[in-house]
């Protein structure tokens, strides 16, 4: 598993992978942070694809994930997942965050994609404490990879160095890197 999980500091929209995961809001129509950056980089075709998903199924609840084309991104697809808003930890946030990662990985597997890049879901405007969120992310991905051949490569793409170091520390403790 060591060679399957990677940490990168930088811009997730520039990474050449099969799938980029978007930390979306329930509307799927773009927003701030990584969601806005992905929508801007992908161009209007991504927004149109998200509008179609909304018409078919309505809003995307926390913990769920949907897949669309990638527009102008250097990826084949975008998985939009909605993480939980942090409300103190007593409102099922940890399970919802785990579900966001797991359901995204299920879509990667179901579509036969080999590589995926995750942002630090829910740690921006949604206020999830970074150490707890990173631990859930690393554990959920490691557990999934232990059971499945795909994806072959998972990237945690961190906007800042501090978060990248946090993920690297967790992976080292787990013996994955």
Swiss-Prot record:
Residues at the active site: 35
Top-level division of the source organism's lineage: Bacteria
Record keywords: Hydrolase
First-tier enzyme category under EC: hydrolase
EC number(s) stated in the UniProt entry for this protein: 3.1.1.106
Keyword Transcription appears in the UniProt entry: no
HAMAP family: YmdB
Protein's name according to its UniProt entry: O-acetyl-ADP-ribose deacetylase
């Amino acid at each position: 598993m060591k060679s399957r999980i990677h940490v990168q500091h930088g811009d997730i929209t520039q990474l050449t992978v099969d799938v980029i995961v978007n930390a979306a809001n329930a509307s799927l129509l773009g927003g701030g942070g990584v969601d806005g950056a992905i929508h801007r980089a992908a161009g209007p075709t991504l927004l149109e694809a998200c509008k179609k998903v909304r018409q078919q199924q309505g809003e995307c609840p926390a913990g769920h994930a949907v897949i669309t084309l990638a527009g102008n991104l250097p990826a084949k697809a975008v998985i939009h997942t909605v993480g939980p808003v942090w409300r103190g930890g007593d409102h099922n946030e940890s399970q919802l965050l785990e579900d966001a990662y797991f359901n995204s990985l299920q879509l990667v597997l179901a579509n036969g994609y080999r590589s995926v890049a995750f942002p630090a879901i829910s740690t921006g405007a949604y206020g999830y404490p970074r150490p707890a969120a990173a631990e859930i992310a690393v554990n959920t991905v490691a557990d999934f990879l232990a059971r499945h051949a795909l994806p072959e490569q998972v990237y945690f793409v961190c906007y800042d160095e501090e978060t990248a170091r946090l993920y690297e520390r967790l992976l080292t403790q787990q013996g994955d890197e």
